[in-house]
Amino acid sequence: MKISREKWSSNFSEWFDWVISQAEIYDYGRYPVKGSGVWMPYGFKIRQNVTTLIRKLLDETGHEEVLFPLLIPETLLKKEAEHIKGFEKEVFWVTHGGEDELEERFALRPTSEVAITLMESLWIKGYSQLPRKFYQIVSVFRYETKATRPMIRVRELSTFKEAHTVHETFEDAARQVDEAVEIYSKFFDILGIPYLISRRPEWDKFAGAEYTIALDTIMPDGRALQIGTAHHLGQHFTKAMDYKVQRADGSHVHPHQTSYGISDRVIATVISINGDDHGPILPPVVAPIEGVIIPIPGKSEEDTEKINKYAMEVESVLKNSGIRVALDASEDKTPGEKYYIWELKGVPIRIEIGPRELNSGTAFLKRRDTLEGKSVKREELVKEFRNLEDQISADLRKRAWEQFKERVKRFQSLDEAKKFLENRGGIAEVPWCGQDSCGLKIEEQVQARVLGTPLKPEPSGNCVVCGKPSTNILRIAKTY
């Protein structure tokens, strides 16, 4: 069955606002603080399932969860000059306690490098304690002056997962950056989110980093969205705070650090990437409800009672197998109205129970992504349900990657790249000599943002600015 995606693709911003509101995911714009939204119960469960997944991946790789204070003293935040220079205009400051002006301002955490470095210096004294990997999932605050967008560009990032690690050598920290990228790649693969991995250019790396690796996806409107970053911090913060560890030979050295993060943008992408005009299509792994049971009334009240009883038995079978399932037995809506509501919420599988299913001892399973259905015997229900979930997950992932690859194109001229980005959107790749000056000219002439270069150099023709042989390709895109 062909499902319309016209609204989803042609007016994505309006579609997204409609979905998060009507599906009761995220209430944005009505809380009286610009750039802040409220996670509603259904949306919070999506968020919870996403954070449960990343926690599992981090815990499995030796990361330890911590929780740091929200407030950071100004003197501490300014310890690393390059870092604060990159964040200063985005910081929210607490200046008063009650009616009293504070002697020192406190920042609402924009990120936690300096705060965590301080505590690492108190906890970790020698090589035998290294490496050490910490993470937390918290709110961070950024004073966004541009137009805000729910989950994508907000002043309070309420689902900020930041990991911070400390190492004896530069090389060990570099390996940790590689591990971070592997963790994120696995995370996004499970969620069915396609991505490109790029090394950010020098002028756009994280403030206080040696280098930054980023993962970007493409949203339905053709704009690229940064969904994960990993930074090699070198010794910038440990030198700024004069933090040293003892080595095996008795000497002392400033340790090397990394940090890497994801945010609410991941949830925005999960909601958006496989949507259609009916609403989102949630992958089973993060769907609050994997299956919804809709009883279809019979011709008589007695038949309807039997159908409802059978629907409750089906619910019990699925729940006892660990499947997140809901039974919509509400009497004030028709089956068609219920279909609309649960499709809008993105529930992966609908289970229809009517007179036919009651008489044959079956259930009718309908996929949210294709709206195709099949009848299954009750004794095979759990197995068939799980198989269908696996198929849905695989098909969503395949479709998302196919859409993504169609929107990544390589060009030999800036004019072609600019035309592509203006007409279709996506990510354009052009030959680049490696000089910052040429990279900045590309940004200026195309009026788009440079995302960076592939991790393995891919020389291709001559630089589109100066004409010299390229050392790599440069990825450019319209962004949020």
UniProtKB/Swiss-Prot annotation:
Function: Catalyzes the attachment of proline to tRNA(Pro) in a two-step reaction: proline is first activated by ATP to form Pro-AMP and then transferred to the acceptor end of tRNA(Pro).
NCBIfam families: proS_fam_I (TIGR00408)
Pfam family, one: ProRS-C_1
Gene Ontology annotations for the cellular component aspect, listed alphabetically: aminoacyl-tRNA synthetase multienzyme complex; cytoplasm
Entry keyword set: Aminoacyl-tRNA synthetase, ATP-binding, Cytoplasm, Ligase, Nucleotide-binding, Protein biosynthesis
Source organism of this protein record: Metallosphaera sedula (strain ATCC 51363 / DSM 5348 / JCM 9185 / NBRC 15509 / TH2)
Membership in a protein family: Belongs to the class-II aminoacyl-tRNA synthetase family. ProS type 3 subfamily.
Signal peptide: none
EC assignment: 6.1.1.15
Catalytic activity field: tRNA(Pro) + L-proline + ATP = L-prolyl-tRNA(Pro) + AMP + diphosphate
The keyword Heme belongs to this UniProt entry's keyword annotation: no
Protein name, entry field: Proline--tRNA ligase
UniProt entry tagged with the keyword Transmembrane: no
Chief location of this protein within or outside the cell: cytoplasm
Source taxon at top rank: Archaea
Listed InterPro entries: aa-tRNA-synt_IIb, aa-tRNA-synth_II, aa-tRNA-synth_II/BPL/LPL, Anticodon-bd, Anticodon-bd_dom_sf, Pro-tRNA-ligase_IIa, Pro-tRNA-ligase_IIa_arc-type, Pro-tRNA_ligase_II_C
Subcellular location: Cytoplasm
Subunit structure: Homodimer.
Comment text on domains: Consists of three domains: the N-terminal catalytic domain, the anticodon-binding domain and the C-terminal extension.
A GO term, aspect molecular function: proline-tRNA ligase activity
